[in-house]
Amino acid sequence: MNLLDPFMKMTDEQEKGLSGAPSPTMSEDSAGSPCPSGSGSDTENTRPQENTFPKGEPDLKKESEEDKFPVCIREAVSQVLKGYDWTLVPMPVRVNGSSKNKPHVKRPMNAFMVWAQAARRKLADQYPHLHNAELSKTLGKLWRLLNESEKRPFVEEAERLRVQHKKDHPDYKYQPRRRKSVKNGQAEAEEATEQTHISPNAIFKALQADSPHSSSGMSEVHSPGEHSGQSQGPPTPPTTPKTDVQAGKVDLKREGRPLAEGGRQPPIDFRDVDIGELSSDVISNIETFDVNEFDQYLPPNGHPGVPATHGQVSYTGSYGISSTAPTPATAGHVWMSKQQAPPPPPQQPPQAPQAPQAPPQQQAPPQPQQAPQQQQAHTLTTLSSEPGQSQRTHIKTEQLSPSHYSEQQQHSPQQISYSPFNLPHYNPSYPTITRSQYDYTDHQNSGSYYSHAAGQGSGLYSTFTYMNPAQRPMYTPIADTSGVPSIPQTHSPQHWEQPVYTQLTRP
């Protein structure tokens, strides 16, 4: 009541200023005149006020309510108690109960609810433009200001309603309804999605840790190349965007690569994974390593210059490597040589003539290894044994090629050490690669690198799986060169597609 006094004074003054006639009624109402007259005077007085003083409406409401409520509230309560004109209280319970199979019985209204319901109706009629939320705030404030005598009628009505409610529902027990399953289901779904995303993200993070710039930047930058290289297990997580672009391919590659990934990280089962990993390494190495040369090769693939170049080149390199796939470690070394090749061109010169595919790394070993390649084309088994060793090297190399194989990238440091051209590894691996590459040439020439990669889930063809169709032209020549990686590839990265390579590959 005290809080409302200033409001009442203000409103009285405003009312006097606005309309002289209504002000006496207001004073009468506040004095305790019957509620209807008070309500009428309030309506007349406050509407002009509301229009004139929009900001003062809450105050007017409060004061008008204050004026009415001692009288009007009692009147409303008396109406409810006497005639049940105010039937909303019992009716909702009964209506709801009848409407539902298992009727939901509402709790009986307490004193404040009785007051709020009656007062809200009166106020809503008088001030239809008022917002319901504002009404609720005002009603709550007024209720706190009421004294015991003013609250008594509402308390009595609430008690009457409680007794009546107990009669109507003798077995009623308050059972608050709890919302079920929606939040839980959503949470479960979110958890599942989080888990789903966690594994790729974790892998991707691991890859990034292995090759921070190359795994994140290169895989993303080389979306075309990586798409082809998505089959590479590690690259796929880093290349989540790529996964979206080539979801199907990525899935196939992932299926082909799961073992490779598992083997890659702790074991050196790069026989299956090496080719793809080498492709990844090649791609990342190419980035750092022969972006210009790869740009030359990019046009055939139709990929944009640098990223395509990286993807293509790395695939080219990976072809060389994939041809070395039997000797994934060797391929890794070769790629490492590439990756390191830019720093050590002297080592590359022998390699450079050989392979545009794996320009520096593969090139140097392949020339001396041309004979060994053909000879050791039979040594695929040897390469298989070597791949373990060379695969370890490979893993390191893959680190050098951060984009595609995080695991390889992890191993890249070692491969870098091998980058000084582990010719011993290269020699056996290249001969192995020679036949592997020849096989790749067939697959690449077939023009379905992905299908071959999928079918050829074994490390060698998986590399081709990484190749993008756009990069196929390069790969086909590269495949040929990788078939004879040491000889034709070394001629020049530009000459990857030379028919000579194909011929060499065929032997």
From Swiss-Prot:
One Pfam assignment: Sox_N
Comp. bias intervals (Polar residues): 42-52, 378-420, 483-507
InterPro entries: HMG_box_dom, HMG_box_dom_sf, Sox_N, SOX_TF
Glycyl lysine isopeptide (Lys-Gly) (interchain with G-Cter in ubiquitin), cross-linked positions: K396
Stretches for region PQA: 63-103
Renumbered ranges of motif 9aaTAD 3: 458-466
Residue numbers covered by motif 9aaTAD 1: 275-284
Chain intervals with Pro residues compositional bias: 341-369
Regions of compositional bias (Basic and acidic residues) in chain numbering: 56-67, 160-174
Compartment list: Nucleus
Phosphoserine PTM sites in chain numbering: S64, S211
Region span, Dimerization (DIM): 63-103
DNA-binding region, residue intervals: 105-173
Biased composition (Low complexity): 30-41
Keyword GTP-binding carried by entry: no
Description of post-translational modifications: Acetylated; acetylation impairs nuclear localization and ability to transactivate expression of target genes. Deacetylated by SIRT1.
Location of region: Disordered: 1-67, 160-250, 335-429, 477-507
Gene3D superfamilies (alphabetical): High mobility group box domain (1.10.30.10)
Ranges where the record places region Transactivation domain (TAC): 392-507
Sequence motif: 9aaTAD 2, positions: 290-298
Subunit details: Homodimer; homodimerization is required for activity. Interacts (via C-terminus) with ZNF219; forming a complex that binds to the COL2A1 promoter and activates COL2A1 expression. Interacts with DDRGK1. Interacts with EP300/p300. Interacts with beta-catenin (CTNNB1); inhibiting CTNNB1 activity by competing with the binding sites of TCF/LEF within CTNNB1.
Domain notes: The transactivation domains TAM and TAC (for transactivation domain in the middle and at the C-terminus, respectively) are required to contact transcriptional coactivators and basal transcriptional machinery components and thereby induce gene transactivation.
Protein name: Transcription factor SOX-9
